[in-house]
Structures are given as C-alpha cells and as structure tokens.
C-alpha cells in the first residue's frame, strides 16, 4: 500500500476517534501537508457525520472555531498545515484555555528528517503551545509498526482529559510525502484496521469513562451563615446556571452584584457606577460573607470591592481552575451554581443594607439624564435591550464598549451573552462572532469596536454564509477610546495609545458583499434593524461617535456618583 493511502488511513482513525467525543465541526485552512486530514474530514461531511468550515486565515479560523465551541457547547476541531499556519492559532488557543472552551487543534507537520535542516515550511511544532493545552499529543509519522488501538487509545485519553478539564488539545501529525495519490477504495479495508472493525462499526468512544457522581453537600454551618449579612457576586455563567440567583438572594435579603456576562437580571443594576460611591462601598464591605458565583468580572469597581473584602469568602464554580485573582482564604465548591443553590435553601429575611437599592434607583434616572436621547456610545450601551431580538445571542467585544454595557446596560434574565474575556484581547472578535452564529440557530448581535474590527477585518468574509439574521455593530470612535481613561498627557495619548485611524467601514462591507448601514438617530436605527432582522444574512451597522463621548460620559458618571449622598 502506498504512503499516501496509509496517511489517509491514519487520518481516518484520528478523526473517527474525535467524532466519538462529540466533534461535529471541522474548521479547515488551506494547505498541502494537511491534505490527508482535510480529505478525511470532507469524507465525514459527505457522510453527513460532520460539517466542514473553511477560512483562508488561520488566526481568524481559530477564533471562528472558538465561537463555534462557545455556542454549540461541543468540542470543535481545527485542521491546519505546517509552519506559521500553526503558530497563527496561538491567540485563539490562549483565549480558549482562559475561558475553558474545547478546541482540538490538528497541526500537520513535516516528518522528523525534515526538521532543523533547512527544509521548507518546517518549524519546531512539537509542544509549540507550551502549557496552554490540557493535553498535547505528538504523533509519529504514520506507520504500520504502531498498532491501531494504540493510536485510538492515545487520542481517546486526551479527549477524556479535555472532558475533565475543559480547554485545548493539540495533536501534532507529521506526514511524509506523497500526499495525493491515495487509493480511495483501499482506505477503509486496510488490514491495519482489521482489529478495530467492530469499533469502527459503532459510534462509541474507545473507553467507557464513567462520570464522577457528585452531589452538592450543604455547608455544615449553612444554618448559621444564612442568617448573616451576605453579598452575592455573579460573574460569567452559562444560561442554565444563571436562573434563580436573584430570587434566591432576594429571599435572603442579600445584596447581588451582577456582571453583564452572568445572564442574571440585576435587582441592583448599574453596580459599576454606584460602587464608586465611597459611603455605600464601605457599608458593603461590612458584610459577613461574600459568595462568588462564576468568575471573570468586567467591572473595575466590583473587582476593587472583591480585592478589599476581608471577611468570609466562598466560591462556587464548576471548573477546577483557580478563579480568585485576589487570593482570599476561601471555601471552594466545585459545582454548578443551580445545584449549589438547591443544596443551600434560603432563609427569608429583610434586606440587611438598603443604600444600594436607593443608589441604584438614583443611578437609573441619573444615567438616563446624562446619556440623553441621541444615538451615541453611552446611549447604545444603556438601551441595549432595545436592539436585541427575543431569541437572540449577544456577542460583546472588548475594550470600552463592554465596560459601558456592563456599567449602564440591563438585559433580561438568562439572555445569552458571549464574550472573549479570557485574555480580553481585541484580536479575532469578528471571527468569534461569526463562529457563534454558525454554532447556533439564533439571530446574533455582535458589538465590536473600530480598532478591533480593523484588526480582524478579513474575518468579515466569514459572514457571507450565515443562515440567520446577523447584526454586526461597529462602534467607531476613531481609535482606542479605552485609553482615554489613562492618566497620560493628551498628545502622547493620541499618538501612542488612541492612534486615530480616520477610517469608516462602508467599503469594507462592500468588499465582502455585506449589507451596510450608518444610522444617525434612534429612529434610523430602528428602521435599519427592522429590515436586518427580516433577512437571513449579515448586516454591518456602523455607529460613528465622537472620539471621547463614551469615555467622558463614563468618567463623569463615576465621578458624580462617587460624591452623591443618598438616604436609605
């Protein structure tokens, strides 16, 4: 049998193993060395056992796969060729590791004899992603010297590790040439596969790993702690885990601080603003117990509160990761939040602190007054619920706008919010949003900053084949407005931080054959959205705002609330 045919046989086993662990999507970049993997992925698609997605840029492809993994809640495989093609996946791998999203990265490689000898497109790929993957598998070149069950069990174990500790698997797969003259009829009947034909004929993983059965056990002193003064702080949570938190805490009379990523409808909205009030913040720090649900908080004021709190501290999160950057002495519950709530019944009692409610109500009217009725960055964040479809998904980019939404916005209970707040980079945000849409059957609204869009501009190509209404808001404040928050001299800030670009995006949308609109008023926007939601395609909506409008409003609100005197 030819080398190319056995390369395909080897690749068939790899991809078969991955599909048994829930892989339904293969994201593929063009390349020669990855041909055996690409053609086997295509065979799975022809058999209607998987879907293949393509993109010409590996960096964007990695983030597209990340978005797919986020919205589909399944592991997503990526196939790339050797060389810097593999290296371009690094940013998405870092983000997936930080957020616990499951990617399986298949990097084709040159065989050993072509490494470190001047051969073309041959770099050091083994373990190239350092400690970011939860499992790294460096396969040998395909050879019948290895029994097929070894290959399956090696990959099966890596997938099991991923199931236990969510994140990235890196599988480096060297192939020798030739790559193209495989006999299709010989691949499935190769004698090397004979020992595993029974396994190939069903759709189960190699090993039957029994799930660890764990019930959440009530804290032994819960009857005492639930009578104390408590604060619930809800960070990034799945939609399933977000339900019921506010009702539980309100029954207890406890204060609830919610992150925009939590999916929890806030009973005390605008916490990032009202926590700037020193008087209320100091009273809140007198709590006996803080319970952190989830992690990764956007709000600077919530993070400052957590850093300063010195009392009893509990953490509830389903991952085994460290999720307390302030290193409290704490009690840790590794559990889903709704399971934990069920195991810890609330005690009905009156609120122990009334000032946050009074200040939150004051903020509501004060923010409305400050943001005004014009269509601008702050008003868009404050009234974000106006632009969202009932059954949609909101993807929030990074930098200033996510902070404005977290500080000024309110979302309905359980409304899905997806972010890249692991490493919080501005790279790959358009690509991630495209992947989110592809992995769901729901309308998607993406809110992206102008610099983020420029950074990932070619990922607009990924929106050409969407199958549901997709709205891409580009908030154009002519540069990195987040840096207006820095105490840097204005001329230096403009040249080295904000970097104004004086660009608009109409021609970019045209280049990728996407619908485009630039509304100037809320009435304009309402009309544009009505049309956009009626089409199963992508629409780019550019909102041009003053360079410092959003940041100035944000700073002004925080400053004025910090001095407010509110009676409980």
Swiss-Prot record:
Signal peptide coordinates: none
Cofactor: record remark: Binds 1 thiamine pyrophosphate per subunit.
- From the UniProt record, list the reaction(s) this protein catalyses: isochorismate + 2-oxoglutarate + H(+) = 5-enolpyruvoyl-6-hydroxy-2-succinyl-cyclohex-3-ene-1-carboxylate + CO2
**In its UniProt record, which GO terms are filed under biological process?**
menaquinone biosynthetic process
Which CDD domains is this protein grouped with?
TPP_PYR_MenD, TPP_SHCHC_synthase
Gene3D superfamilies in the record: 3.40.50.970, TPP-binding domain
**Obligatory cofactor(s):** Mg(2+); Mn(2+); thiamine diphosphate
The pathway is: Quinol/quinone metabolism; 1,4-dihydroxy-2-naphthoate biosynthesis; 1,4-dihydroxy-2-naphthoate from chorismate: step 2/7; Quinol/quinone metabolism; menaquinone biosynthesis
Q: Which GO terms describe its molecular function?
A: 2-succinyl-5-enolpyruvyl-6-hydroxy-3-cyclohexene-1-carboxylic-acid synthase activity; magnesium ion binding; manganese ion binding; thiamine pyrophosphate binding
EC no. given is: 2.2.1.9
Going by the UniProt record, its keywords in alphabetical order are:
Magnesium, Manganese, Menaquinone biosynthesis, Metal-binding, Thiamine pyrophosphate, Transferase
Q: How does it assemble?
A: Homodimer.
Q: Which family does it belong to?
A: Belongs to the TPP enzyme family. MenD subfamily.
**What is the documented function of this protein?**
Catalyzes the thiamine diphosphate-dependent decarboxylation of 2-oxoglutarate and the subsequent addition of the resulting succinic semialdehyde-thiamine pyrophosphate anion to isochorismate to yield 2-succinyl-5-enolpyruvyl-6-hydroxy-3-cyclohexene-1-carboxylate (SEPHCHC).
Spell out the protein name for this chain: 2-succinyl-5-enolpyruvyl-6-hydroxy-3-cyclohexene-1-carboxylate synthase
State the organism named in the record.
Mannheimia succiniciproducens (strain KCTC 0769BP / MBEL55E)
